[in-house]
Amino acid sequence: MNLITIERHILEQQKFFPEFTGELTDLLNDVAFAAKLVRREVVRAGLVDILGFTGDTNIQGEQVKKLDLFANDKIINAIGQHGRFAIMGSEENDGIIIPPKNETGSYALLFDPLDGSSNIDVNVSVGTIFSIYKLKGDDPGKASLNDCLQHGYEQVAAGYVIYGSSVVMVYTTGHGVHGFTYDPTIGEFLLSHENIVTPKSGKYYSINEGSYGQFNEGTKKYLDYIKEEDPATGRPYSTRYIGSLVADFHRNLLTGGIFVYPPTITHPNGKLRLMYEANPLAFICEQAGGRATNGKERILDLQPSELHQRTPLYIGSEADVMIAEEFEQGKR
């Protein structure tokens, strides 16, 4: 492993953004610091009283886990105190968040504090996903919901942190995708995956097939297709589904394959959150040479209309996603 810290690497990336005068370095360093705080508690979750539910329900209609709430508070407090973000949005909060010292901020932060948290009680990998936008206006005091509801292609940075057998942080600023592994002996994220490029096609698919009866005909035909025996096209594919989006996405990013969360009868507009999950992962995926759509349109081109907007998601290796789109659009 290279002894290049994430701070040094981000500083080197700053040359691509001279107009930010060092701000981008500070923004991503803030996120990395918050991730260290969350990581500290995730690895101790079974030893302290932060497993289980709080008894509350979030805006998504889901029961709030204690660790969800802890991670959410840590990120807001750790990042908000530095005055670089004028406004935030979290999957766990109903509305926008105005952090302390927001009057000096020039950016908006959107994040899922603990993706896959339903798995934490059984020690399955979970993660934090984040997305950063520049404010539309010049006055931080006037930051509003509109600053959060920007197209995905307007992101200036995005990334995620996986808390698993090791802790890995992956980020992009629009100039490639880079991964860092946390070394607990020195308390630093060190460069471990430079310039990640996802394979053009893979051999894995990730989907909750327990919902097969809820899928539309296009999705069902696609699943039948990738299970057929055809060595010439690398079929059949193998299923790899953890149930933690960030973990499934990370594996497919490195090995090739596709993650699918299609529309269902119960959730015709999809279930994943556009602003907290789909947009940041789509930005990363495209920067690594992959593709991300809702089955019909590019994820990064979607115009958000609400903070907690949902979307179907087809994301991963370019060739695999294109085939899935053809089935979804009735072209196969």
Curated annotation (Swiss-Prot):
What Enzyme Commission number(s) apply to this enzyme?
A: 3.1.3.11
GO MF annotation, one = magnesium ion binding
GO terms for CC?
A: cytosol
Annotated compartments: Cytoplasm
* A Gene Ontology biological process term: reductive pentose-phosphate cycle
As cofactor, the record names: Mg(2+)
Question: Could you tell me which CDD domains the record lists for this protein?
Answer: FBPase (cd00354)
Q: Which reaction does it catalyse?
A: beta-D-fructose 1,6-bisphosphate + H2O = beta-D-fructose 6-phosphate + phosphate
- Pathway note: Carbohydrate biosynthesis; Calvin cycle
> What enzyme class is recorded for this protein?
hydrolase
Its main localization is cytoplasm
- Keywords, comma-separated and alphabetical: Calvin cycle, Carbohydrate metabolism, Cytoplasm, Hydrolase, Magnesium, Metal-binding
InterPro entries for the chain: FBPase_C_dom, FBPase_class-1, FBPase_N, FBPtase
The lineage's top-level taxon is: Bacteria
Record's cofactor remark: Binds 2 magnesium ions per subunit.
Q: Which residues bind substrate?
A: 115-118, 208, 241, 271
Question: Which positions bind Mg(2+) 2?
Answer: 112, 115, 277
Where does this protein hold Mg(2+) 1? Answer: 91, 112, 114
Subunit-level organization: Homotetramer.
By its UniProt entry, which PANTHER family does this protein fall under? FRUCTOSE-1,6-BISPHOSPHATASE-RELATED, SEDOHEPTULOSE-1,7-BISPHOSPHATASE, CHLOROPLASTIC
The family note in this entry says: Belongs to the FBPase class 1 family.
Tell me what this protein is called.
Fructose-1,6-bisphosphatase class 1
- Name the lineage: Bacteria, Pseudomonadati, Chlorobiota, Chlorobiia, Chlorobiales
